[in-house]
Regions:
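Outer-membrane beta-barrel translocator domains and adjoining extracellular loop/strand segments
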Residues: 116-120, 182-190, 224-231, 278-304, ...
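Transmembrane beta-barrel architecture of outer-membrane proteins
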Residues: 142, 148-153, 194-197, 249-251, ...
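Detector for outer-membrane/organellar transmembrane beta-barrel domains
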Residues: 328-496
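C-terminal segment of classical bacterial N-terminal signal peptides
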Residues: 4-15
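N-terminal periplasmic/intermembrane-space "pro-region" immediately following the signal or transit peptide
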Residues: 14-121
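Outer membrane beta-barrel
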Residues: 87-130, 134-284, 314-332, 371-386, ...
């Protein structure tokens, strides 16, 4: 057909008086050109299928047809004998498979905090224990300085083509922010590798379909283009816990995506569930009134390859996320929906064998936008998440649910939003600033003398300020002195941060970047009531000033 089209076009420009011999000569010449093109294509395919054989015979570097069809990649030549430094050659091709370690880096991070969170370059979520310490503990007046290489990352990406329209991809990414029971920061500074991402992806260009299976950023996480893994618009902060208002998980999932000419994208993701409950210092864990008893989670076991020092929530169904994204040519826009199911066991202690399972439905909606106000120089962004039981998806890890008066779980309404700007004023420079908030609504109850829920106005909060000087309590997050109580249910977590990255070197040996970040974090607690001691509700707004620095070497970028 290709020949016929070309021939028909050629005939169209032949003058009417041209004789048949001249026309035949033109057709024969075109046939010879087509045959030469076919031989060249066959030779290219043969060379790409046998790259090692060509290298072993000393033949010139073979030409490999890249994934985008007419893109030609010529690998660099072999280094000369005795060369002191090998020529950088990653990403590479092996038997038609494209292998890249781009994204790997060696990091040295530092953190200074006005309040001691006992953390490194990845701050604890502000609501966590310890998180930001309260004024009733010695941690409040302690300064903190840490150095760490734990954010150093190993990344491996593999691409291959089934045929010109079907493609496979695998990606693995790990860092060292895990800590086993024998990890320490005193002598060996030994820490545990952990999975960040590990997934496989299938793409079909004809039907515009994509499928992902494995652990990746949640579909709920905002993207800068489309909605496939690798296009997430993650914050560029040094702090690995990012900023309140940034909604994210890295989660095991199965994702299906359809794209309409790469302009509109529609996706569905089935993801690993988990339920976040109030921390141990919170009265949100108060049990329902007798004789009702509940079981909201189970102890994880090492035999099941889970962390035996934590608990696993009772989950009966995956989290379901739907998302639509649009790339009309200027900016990127997203909307999404979320469905979740929380479950616990409820029994009446006076009735034998009365355990029964209760299920609570939760939901969320949200969206994001990315606006290239000055293309390649300045972009603005924003995102929002609202719903019942959405705390797990917030950077602050606010609770999803609490126990209700009848023993079943009741979802906590939450709101999260973020605004930010990223600028590239000159080559190799990136300046960023973000402001974000995570909020939770009160969800409380009182039955007789029993009170519970989240943000209950009857919870006692008179023990936030006075420091407990009792032995053994100095390094504990929340340590009210005897006769005082501090519930501290978090109503709001806020952060403003600003920072920059600067390329110090970029060339054949890779890339070296240095960065600085400053963040101001502030919590607001539900007030509760003082007791007969007359102590007012002080200490409702603990805060922290934090500074980070980082030096990172990317050998393959």
């Amino acid at each position: 057909m290709f020949c016929l089209v070309l021939c028909s076009q050629r005939v169209a420009v032949v003058p009417a008086h041209a004789d048949e011999q001249q026309l035949q000569r033109q057709i024969d010449a075109m046939k010879r050109q087509l045959e030469a093109m076919q031989r060249e294509l066959a030779q290219t395919r043969k060379q790409s299928a046998q790259p090692r054989a060509g290298a072993a015979s000393g033949a010139p570097s073979q030409v490999v047809t890249a994934r985008k069809g007419n893109e030609i990649i010529i690998p660099p030549p072999e280094p000369p004998p005795g060369a002191s430094m090998p020529v950088k050659s990653l990403p590479s091709w092996f038997d038609g498979i494209h292998v890249s370690m781009a994204g790997s880096f060696i990091a040295l991070d530092g953190a200074w905090r006005q309040r001691n969170e006992v953390s490194n370059g990845a701050s604890d979520p502000p609501f966590a224990n310890p998180g930001i310490p309260l004024q009733n503990t010695a941690l409040w007046s302690e300064r903190e300085f840490r150095l760490s290489a734990q954010q150093s990352r190993i990344a491996l990406k593999v691409n291959g083509d089934i045929d010109p329209s079907q493609h496979l991809k695998a990606y693995y990414e790990m860092d060292f922010l895990g800590a086993s029971t024998d990890a320490n920061n005193r002598e060996s500074n030994s820490f545990t590798p952990r999975i960040r991402q590990a997934y496989a992806q299938y793409d079909n260009d004809v039907y515009h379909l994509h499928a992902v299976a494995g652990q990746a950023w949640s579909l709920l996480t905002k993207n800068y283009y489309g909605m496939l893994p690798g296009t997430e618009n993650a914050l560029v902060t040094i702090n690995a816990q990012y900023v309140p208002g940034f909604d994210w998980l890295r989660n095991p999932q199965v994702r299906f995506v359809y794209d309409w000419d790469k302009i509109a994208w529609f996706g569905l993701s089935i993801e690993q569930p988990a339920t976040v409950f109030p921390g141990g210092v919170s009265a949100g864990t108060v049990s329902p009134p007798a004789p009702i008893i509940t079981s909201i989670n189970n102890t994880c076991t090492g035999a099941s390859h889970l962390n035996g020092t934590t608990t696993c929530s009772n989950d009966i169904a995956p989290d379901i996320i739907e998302k639509a994204a649009f790339d009309p040519g200027w900016g990127h826009y997203e909307v999404f929906g979320l469905q979740r199911w929380f479950t616990d066991q409820v029994a009446i202690s006076t009735i034998p064998n009365s355990w029964s399972q209760k299920t609570t439905f939760a939901w969320g909606v949200g969206g994001s936008l990315l606006l290239p106000v000055i293309p390649k120089v300045l972009e603005l962004q924003g995102s929002v998440l609202y719903g019942d039981g959405v705390g797990r998806y917030m950077s602050s890890q606010l609770p999803d649910a609490v126990i209700g008066p009848n023993g079943s779980l009741t979802a906590i309404t939450g709101l999260s939003f973020l605004v930010g700007a990223v600028a590239h004023p000159f080559e190799g420079n990136e300046i960023y600033t973000y402001y974000g908030e995570d909020r939770s609504d009160a969800n409380s109850w009182k039955v007789g003398a029993t009170q519970g829920g989240w943000g209950n106005p009857n919870f006692v909060n008179n023990g936030r300020v006075n420091q407990n000087l009792t032995g053994g309590t100095l390094g504990v997050f929340n340590t009210p002195i005897a006769g005082f109580t501090c519930t501290f249910d978090v109503q709001k977590a806020q952060e403003f941060t600003i920072g920059f990255w600067q390329d110090m070197y970029k060339g054949d040996a890779g890339r070296v970047r240095a960065g600085l970040q400053y963040g101001y974090v502030r919590l607001t607690a539900f007030p509760g009531v003082p007791t007969g001691t007359g102590t007012p509700n002080l200490g409702l707004h603990p805060n922290n000033n934090i500074a980070f620095f980082s030096i990172r070497y990317y050998p393959f970028n």
